Amino acid sequence: MKRRTIILSTASITAVFAFGWNLTARAAYESAPYKVLEKDGNIEVREYPDLLLAATGSRVASNGRDGSFMKLFRYISGDNENKQKIEMTTPVFMEDGVKSPDALMGFVMPKSVADSGAPAPKSSGVVLHNRKGGRFAVIRFSGRINSKMAAKQEAVLRAWLLKNGLQGEARADTAGYDPPFTPGPFRRNEVLIPLKEQVVVVDDVSGKTDAPSSNAESKDPSR
């Protein structure tokens, strides 16, 4: 019994240490900015600005093992026209990364690089891509993400949208925030669905609108 208690205590300490270390490591990277407009458990409605990505085609099921991750890593490591080294950021986006077998993997350019102009890629397989901002419904979850897991989370998120009277685009993206060596339980993954803009119809006589009102308050995002 004593030995079992010691083993359990050691496992608990290791888990707490790993969790704390992972949060510290994640906080070391600049992250894509957003504002939280509404929160319901692990689901949020966020407002994102336009973002500049260094991007390349990727097979979703490969989780970057098809060489797509390394293409982008080489770009930020100096394989560009200016031989400029660019800081790694979070998250790594996979646009249309749930349904489509072929997606676009993208590294977010740091704000200073985006503002001054990102260097042109040397590799023909890497492009600079403007990711359009706007409102997104987002669900957060842990584990080692794969196509099946992402599809399951997308279904949960779309059910929430239907329940709350919101309409999402057909596309669903994924986002990952952690290095490959991070244990599954401590990983931060997300599925993001762009929201359709609601059309507001104004009654010429009364001035009333048929758009639903929202009492959600904007707040700064938390990691």
Would you name each region that the model predicts?
Residues 2-223:
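A solvent-exposed interaction/effector surface
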